[in-house]
Each structure stands twice: as C-alpha cells, then as structure tokens.
Amino acid sequence: MMFTKSTALALAAIVALSNVNAFSTSIHQPITSKAAHITSSSSLQAANNGLDTDTTLPSFSTKEEYTSYLQKAGRLPSGFAVGTAKGTFVSVEAPALGPLPIKATVIHLTEGPTDSWAAVFTKQSGCPVKVGKARLSGGHPLQALVINNKVSNVCPGGDGIAAAESVCAAVASSLNLPGGANSVLPSSTGVIGWRLPAKELAEDVAPRAIEALQTESAYAAAEAIMTTDRYPKLRSKTLSDGVRVVGVAKGAGMIEPNMATMLGYIMTDATIEKSKLQTMLTEACNRSFNSISVDGDESTSDTVVAIASGLKPLSSEDELKDALFEVCEGLSADLVRNGEGTGHVIRVTISNFPGSEYDARRMGRHLVNSPLVKCAISGNDPNTGRIAGAIGSFMGKFFPTESVAEMSLTLGGRTIFNNGQFVLEGDAVEKELSGHMSDAQLGEHDDFPKHQKFVEIGVDFGGSGSDVIVLGSDLTKEYVEVNADYRS
C-alpha cells in the first residue's frame, strides 16, 4: 500500500468508523576580586559522590519530599554560585494590574571567565536572545548569567536590547567582572510585549540576587526561573572522575522546539574545548528538547546554555557527552510532565521511519500535537482511529509515495493496527487500553510529580529507517484556564 492522497482519505474513513555558535579550549582566568558575600558549604563541596537525580525519577508522596530530593541532587559543580531574589514592578502596558512579582536569578563563575560555553537559541528571537547571539558571535568569554521571569522582553515598546544590556551592566558592576556587560548573558521569560522593568531589576532585584549567591545547590535557580510551572525542574550527574553536570530548566506552555525550547542552563566543572561542548549540546538538544511538544507554540525566548568552569580535568569526553544528554533528556521529560494543565504525558516511539530523524521527529510532534489525539487521551478514551488518522494526515501530506504495508501501531504495548487494519475485538481490549491511560494520569493541580508514567504509543513502519522518541501532553480544561488568566 502506498501513502497517496487517496490512501490518506481511506484511512480517514477507517478512522470515522472505528542553532548556534561554537567555542574552543576553556580559558580559566582567576580574578582577585570576588563577591565577598558568597557563602559555601564545605561538606557539599568536599566530595563529588553526592546524590544525583535518577535517570527515571522515583515516585514522591509530598511536595516536601520532592523539594528535598532536588535540593540534595542540585549540588553545584566547582566554580559556580547561584543567587535569587524577588521584587515587584508595575507594567507600563497594564498599570491597572498593580504591583506584580518578578524574580531575578544570577549564576556566577566564581573563579573567573570562561570561553567554554555553548548555546542553542530559538529561530524567532526576542531581545535577550539577540543579545545572547551577539555574545556568541563576538566570541566573548562569560562569567555570569542573569535571568528574570514574568516579562519576556520581546517586541516591547522602547529599546528592549538596551534594557537587557543595562541589567547585564548592573550585574557586571556588582560582581566587578573584568569583562563588563559583555561577560554577562541575559535571559527573560514571561509576558510578550511588555517592557522589561530594567530599572527595578538593575537597581534592586539583581543586586539582591547577587547578595544571596551561594555555592551549595542549583535548586534556588530552578525555582526562581519558573512562570506557570507548577514545580521546579533539576537534573544532575556525577562522572566517574568526579566531574559534575547539573541542569535546571523552566517551561510549561509555548513548548514546541525549533533549535531549542524554553530556558535551560547546564553547568559543569569539566575542562572541555568549546567546539566540542557545542557539538555535544546541539546533539543532546536534538535528541531531547527538540523532541517534545506541549502545545505546538514556539517561544521567542527559548535558550539552552551549557557552561564549563574548567576546574576539573576530564577523563572521558564520551562520558561527559552521555551525562549531558541524560540531563537534557530528563529535563525535557520534566517539562512535558509539568506542562500547563498536563493530565497525561504521551511517549511516542517511532521505529524504522522511511526518512530522516528530523522528519521522524516532525511526524511524532504532529501526532502529539493533534487536538483530537490530545483530547481522547485526556478523557482516557482509547479512540485509536484518531492516532491512525493523525499519522495518515502527516504521511499523506509529506510522504505520499511511501509504503506503509508493514506499519503497525501499539498502545500501551498492545498491537492496535497491523497489516492495514485495526486489531480491536472485544470489550476486554477497550478496557485494557483505557486502563493504560488511566494508570498514567496525573492530578489536575499537582505541585510535584507523583509518578513518571507515560501513555505509550508505538509506530513501527517495518523495514529499516530512523528511530526516535517524541514526548507530548494531552489537552485539558486546566490548560485553557491557565492561559486565560496568564497575565494576572
């Protein structure tokens, strides 16, 4: 059978019936003037055999249990300090809303600037992303990052780039950075179209975040960068030689990748050439953040940064590469599980796709972005025709001449479509499939991840081809409610 337009229509009838720049060797330049207020925990810094996050997170019974787990697993790599602070501002665009909360996060390389940093940015750039791209193209070493939530600084009135630069300059001044504002990378997330409250950030919130700098855990950063996120996201891995990799991320809505997605910051104390770090990050992002979708909307602020302090020798580049991917993979799964209104996380495993990995990911995202598929899964309704219909829609548009004679579909490990027809007989099958969905359901207002289960969909085209995994979420009433009330 060939996937012509008529085939796609026939399948629909069946359904009715049933990017980025590079770096080179890490430059570690110790400086004598450091923020005197940085605190340290000798017990946490002394050993490199502390707790890491599990590849698959355990089940948690309470928010406190989850928080404690992340705080311990978030032990910072050598040479990093993190500080956060809260403040308020009044939006020029919506003054009737009154004072609104805003948070700033500062990540500081305590021992000096580094050239060994990599980044992947969205293709549709807001002001902070434009500044970040300029930092990369200019070859500037980094010594700090500053992140604010609540306002994304995208297409604002006034000069958004100048506003971002003024905050960077304030951070550089407070930390006495020899590289000045060019050694600070800005990120913003929040409401699009509002002016960045640069004065409040530069004169109040960011300086207080610097006063709060500590070298213990990255957990505070994971918490402070949240917007509509229900809980913080953090992953970590310690290599056999003691090198540490710790990542934090935020994102709950507008999650659809295009080079990168959401905000993510990965810190390591490894000594690694910047060009190699860039290659590792790009590959890790393609296999993780670029393989997820919550709602199909791309953000204009999306940024993923990996930065190395260079304080520890690296025994194995392959081990670092694997650790970087494991951290990115874990964070990307956490983003979907924490998606706005997510009631189920969908994991689509595509095997032997008759095209590139890029196109296989496109098909997977097309499937998880289908409103009909999302709604069926939200209601624990095993309407398998909607899954087949979404696949038929994609293949009919983009691969109309490809044969699907050997294609099979599974739901929860059970075959539901094979040899050109559905395999659905008896109430027991319906009950089994619905039970699989119900078992993976999340609570409407969970403020911590109670489990790590997925609604499992398998698509095997037979023969040989590309293999990918794509994650997505269902569509719930809560998603509509969150986005209806977002600015307030």
From Swiss-Prot:
Membership in a protein family: Belongs to the ArgJ family.
Top EC category: transferase
Localization (cell): Mitochondrion matrix
Pfam family, one: ArgJ
Any one GO CC term of the record: mitochondrial matrix
Keywords from the UniProt entry: Acyltransferase, Amino-acid biosynthesis, Arginine biosynthesis, Autocatalytic cleavage, Mitochondrion, Multifunctional enzyme, Transferase
SUPFAM superfamilies assigned to the protein according to its UniProt record, in alphabetical order: DmpA/ArgJ-like
Residues that, per the record, bind substrate: 227, 250, 261, 340, 483, 488
Post-translational modification: The alpha and beta chains are autoproteolytically processed from a single precursor protein within the mitochondrion.
Name this polypeptide is given: Arginine biosynthesis bifunctional protein ArgJ, mitochondrial
Assembly notes: Heterodimer of an alpha and a beta chain.
